[in-house]
Each structure stands twice: as structure tokens, then as C-alpha cells.
């Protein structure tokens, strides 16, 4: 399967390629938008390096070594704000969780179903 996407955001952004090898999890690769971290600074600057360190927690998409992929896209609807007394997770951490821990699509669904989702930045999102 091939997956493609664009970054046609309102504001200019720098896409950072993120390779992650979590201890006890699956290796993955994906992109983070540095403007979501408050900077588009060059990586040779202090601000750029600080943003790059946060890249694994600001990914917009990725695929892990098992072939599980996840992409987040924005919606024009009321932001998700579940409250069913489950542990809370936000959009970025949901992506990290799936990439690090899911070996199949069903595992990804099961992992995410264990949390109350809270959308970030006042927007609503969906995953594919």
C-alpha cells in the first residue's frame, strides 16, 4: 500500500523527518511539522534543535516496522473532547502510541479505544 499526503497548511512549515527506535517498541519513520512546535528555525539554531528533539511527539504521520501506518488530518467540526473516565490522550500522543506499540490495525484500534481522546489546538481530527 502507498500512502501520500500534502502539507497545505495556512502557515509555512518545515517538515522534519523523524526516525524513532523506542526501547521495547517498534521502530518507525514519519514527519513532524516544526511550526506545530512554535518554530520553523533552522536545525543549526538552538530553537531548531529544541524543536527537533520534540519531533517524535509532534508527528503528523508515520509507519512502523510492522507496516502499521497512521496519518492525522484536520476536520472542520467541533474538537473531540471525550469524557468516559478512561485515561486521557491527545492527538500527538495517539500517533506515537500507535507507531510504538501496534503491530496490526486491530491492535491500533484496541490501543486507542482504551483512552479518551482530546483534540489539540482547537481543531478536530481524524486518523487514517
Residue ranges and their predicted role:
Residues 110-128:
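Internal, well-folded beta-alpha domain core
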